Amino acid sequence: MAAPNNPANDCTGLPSSAVLEAALKAVVPSAAGGSATGTNGGLDFPMWATVVNRYGVICSVATSGSTADDAWLNSRVISAQKAYTANGFSRPTFALSTANLFTPTQNGNSLNGLQFSNPVDPRVVYRGNPTKYGTPDDPMIGLKPGGINVFGGGVALYSTGGKLGALGVSGDTSCADHNIAWKLRNRLATAGFSGVTVANRVPGGVRSAQVGSSNQPVAPSGDDGIMYGSTGFQHADCGNGEKNVVLPAVNN
């Protein structure tokens, strides 16, 4: 984890790469390198996960694959991009997931072009020894990846004291990525470290009870859950059973 002497590099309350890996493997099935029963929808492929702090600096990176290229290699960068996006567009009292940005950024919609702003920094995401990818020595740790991602898989992380940062996952369909990120955020509250003290804590968001899914209970003040459709802050249905997956409830 990044050294906390510089406030921008403070990863207090956020998981180490080892804790992140253990939590990730607990929410994906054996086909994806994990131990979970059931499926998250999608392809059940090995996953990447990245956590950033509230300034967008990477604190930890992990994979559920046995080697760096067991999962889609490009998804390592995408997971970092998703974490950076979810953090940058979530406030202490209002969360936006990357899934919430899908429809607003399509052609003709109000946020079209957002995905081309704040590009990924290639000097960060492609640096270093590839054999270190997804380990506690991942070369991205301690740096800002940049990038804006506008499909499922990135969610903010909150404690009772406010926003801690965000996590991003990638390696499957974008809808399955959202499901895994949602479950992973919930798991991190019980993974044996301080900080994310309330499972799936989200103080508010664009999803309300009127547009929620029975498989994804909505927090009273709204949350950053995925909504399937083509209007507002909705996301395309990936078509591989992802929308039928039962997800943990959200807490305010």
Give short role names for the model-derived ranges.
Residues 2-252:
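Flexible, solvent-exposed loop/hinge segments and secondary-structure transition points
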